[in-house]
Structure formats: structure tokens, C-alpha cells
Regions:
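Acidic, low-complexity central loop/insert segments
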Residues: 1-79, 145
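Glycine-rich, small/acidic residue-mixed loop/short-helix segments
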Residues: 94-102, 116-188
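Short, charged, solvent-exposed linker or helix-capping segments at domain edges/interfaces
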Residues: 63, 85, 174-175
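Generic marker of residues within folded, mature protein domains
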Residues: 15, 46, 64, 108, ...
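A mid-sequence, solvent-exposed acidic-amphipathic segment
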Residues: 67-120, 124-125, 130
Length: 188
């Protein structure tokens, strides 16, 4: 699924990859429903993280939203297209391996060579990371450490955030505007 603001771009991008396949890509005009708890018969477990609950595609919009999905997604480090994910994002830098977004056993796919090389021959030097924020900072604010640019704050929900960081500089105390920033995960 894709946000309505991203649908045309996604349809155009998928059209580039269909090559000679007899496939028509159209807008399904369905609405995403999501929830926590048991998965309904017409739904499926969100594959990105067990705590993200379930999703279903239905004809009418959801009217019973009770979960702050943005806060949950940011706390779980689930990047979203148009916010943390841009057209030039490398999927491993976006932590796609952790959210079941890439399979190294699959055959051919666009970007496979670059992705495999990044996985097997190098250590990531930069990418998305979960951060704790003490204070308020606007999204897009530069994050600094020891007077050097360490990254950019991309999202904030409460005291959690998602930032794009240079991992070599994001090892200690950092700031974004007047807010104190601390890296939560240390996987890279």
C-alpha cells in the first residue's frame, strides 16, 4: 500500500519494471485498515514488526482509529515513504533487513547487486537510526556531535525519533537545535 500522495509516483515506478510482462497497474482505490489484537479474516499480520498489529484492505475508510500509529511506527523504527524514505534511499541504510523488507535468498530484483555488496562486503557508515530526544526539535534539524554534523532528525513522536546518521559521529552526546539526542540502537 502507499499513501495517496505517493500513489502516482509508485504506479509510474512499477510501470518501469514490468518490462514485457502482460500486467496492468491501476489504482485499487481501497483503504488501509489497521489494528492491534487478533487478525481479522480479511487481514494479515503486518510483516514489518509484530507490534505493528494487522492490516486489511477494504472499500470504506477506517473510522475507529484508536492507536497513534505515527508514535508506534517511530518508536519501532519503521520508516515511511515520503518521510524517512526518499527515492534515493538505499534499503539497507533504511534498516529494511530488520523489517523484512529485503530477502537475500530471492533471485533477481532491481538493485540486487548494490544491496548484496553493501550487505556482504562493507559496514554501513550511515543510515536510519532510532534516537531518544530530550526536548523539541523540528524535523529536518541538523544533529551535531562535537561541533560536527552527525545527521538529520527526520521524525519525532514524543521522546522517540528517527534520524539519518553518520554512525562514526553518532557515538556520544548529540544535539538537534536545543534538544539532546541519544542513539538508541547500536547495530551499526
Amino acid at each position: 500500500d502507499a499513501d495517496a500522495s505517493q500513489a502516482d509516483m509508485l504506479r509510474m515506478r512499477l510501470g518501469m519494471y514490468r518490462l514485457r510482462a502482460d500486467v496492468t497497474i491501476t489504482d485499487a482505490a481501497l483503504f488501509v485498515h489497521r489494528g492491534l489484537g487478533p487478525v481479522p479474516k480479511d487481514g494479515f499480520a503486518d510483516p514489518r514488526h509484530t507490534e505493528m498489529g494487522w492490516r486489511a484492505y477494504r472499500d470504506a475508510p477506517q473510522t475507529d482509529e484508536t492507536v497513534d500509529w505515527t508514535a508506534l511506527r517511530v518508536a519501532l523504527m519503521i520508516p515511511e515513504t515520503g518521510i524517512e524514505l526518499t527515492p534515493d534511499t538505499f534499503i539497507l541504510e533504511a534498516q529494511f533487513e530488520a523489517i523484512n523488507g529485503v530477502d537475500f535468498r530471492k533471485g533477481c530484483y532491481v538493485g540486487q547487486e548494490v544491496t548484496a555488496r553493501m550487505k556482504h562486503k562493507t559496514t554501513l557508515r550511515k543510515g536510519l537510526a532510532s534516537v531518544a530526544i530530550d526536548g523539541l526539535a523540528e524535523t529536518g534539524t541538523e544533529i551535531t556531535a562535537d561541533g560536527k554534523v552527525a545527521g538529520t532528525l527526520l521524525s519525532q513522536a514524543g521522546n522517540s525519533g528517527i534520524a539519518y546518521l553518520r554512525f562514526d559521529r553518532a557515538t556520544g552526546e548529540m544535539t538537534a537545535g536545543g534538544a539532546k539526542v541519544t542513539r538508541k540502537d547500536t547495530g551499526n
